[in-house]
């Protein structure tokens, strides 16, 4: 879905503010897709923990030197494909079923990293900063916090056994079956958050994780 010119979103509308920063992380803009992440392109950090990004002219600068003019579209939260596969089978009295599901493409904003990597949360989070792990994370939206949204998950798995009933029992019971079901047995994903499926994919905050998880 793209916004037509008739919607008159000239210059774009910033949307979403998470991670205990005042930065918006998505933009609604004419001719662009819903769910675009918007911010600064990450270029790296120095030995002192200072973050660097790319300016609009392609030069590497400290994040403190970047302005809104340097912001670019960093990717989109919507997956290219969402898929699912389910199967059931039986052998004599034993039955087995499972389902797989997943998504291909799209970016996820790890707001947990953004929030707890922000200096404003150090005191409340009781975090220890030492020469080994000390950094000065930026209070800016950057693709440093964007991760792949591709995943595959083994969802529900059920193993059952149907009892063979004699004629006397059938007077009172049509059938009897015992089964065991397990959920969310395995997830294959490069997302470093809790679960790529817990990320918000509705409303206006597409692809943003929840700092509460």
Tell me what each language-model feature is.
Residues 1-77, 183-193:
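Conserved small-residue
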Residues 9-18, 113-122, 191-203:
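Flexible, surface-exposed loop regions and adjacent strand-edge segments
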Residues 14, 33, 41, 88, ...:
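Membrane-proximal, glycine/serine-rich, low-complexity loop/turn segments characteristic
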Residues 23-24, 65-73, 78, 126, ...:
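Extracytoplasmic loops and strand-loop junctions of Gram-negative outer membrane beta-barrel proteins
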Residues 41, 86-88, 158-162, 181, ...:
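Outer-membrane beta-barrel architecture
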Residues 79-83, 150-155, 213:
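Residues that define the transmembrane beta-barrel architecture of outer-membrane proteins
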Residues 85, 91, 96-98, 176-180:
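Transmembrane beta-strands of outer-membrane beta-barrel proteins
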Residues 101-185:
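Extracytoplasmic gating/loop element in the C-terminal half of outer-membrane beta-barrel translocons
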């Amino acid at each position: 879905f793209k916004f037509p010119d008739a919607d008159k979103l000239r210059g774009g509308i910033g949307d979403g503010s998470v991670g205990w920063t005042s930065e918006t992380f998505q933009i609604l803009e004419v001719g662009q897709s819903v769910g675009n992440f918007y911010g600064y392109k990450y270029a790296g950090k120095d030995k002192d923990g200072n973050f660097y990004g790319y300016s609009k002219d392609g030069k590497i600068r400290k994040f403190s030197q970047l302005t809104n003019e340097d912001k670019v579209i960093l990717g989109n939260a919507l997956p290219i494909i969402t898929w699912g596969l389910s199967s059931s089978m039986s052998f004599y009295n034993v039955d087995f079923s499972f389902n797989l599901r997943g998504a291909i493409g799209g970016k996820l904003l790890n707001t947990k990293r953004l929030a707890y990597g922000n200096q404003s949360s150090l005191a409340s989070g009781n975090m220890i900063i030492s020469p080994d792990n000390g950094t000065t994370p930026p209070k800016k939206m950057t693709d440093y916090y964007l991760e792949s949204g591709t995943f595959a998950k083994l969802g529900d798995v059920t193993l059952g056994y149907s009892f063979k009933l004699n004629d006397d029992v059938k007077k009172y019971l049509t059938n009897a079956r015992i089964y065991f079901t397990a959920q969310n047995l395995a997830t294959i994903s490069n997302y470093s958050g809790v679960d790529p499926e817990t990320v918000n994919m509705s409303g206006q905050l597409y692809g943003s994780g929840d700092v509460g998880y």
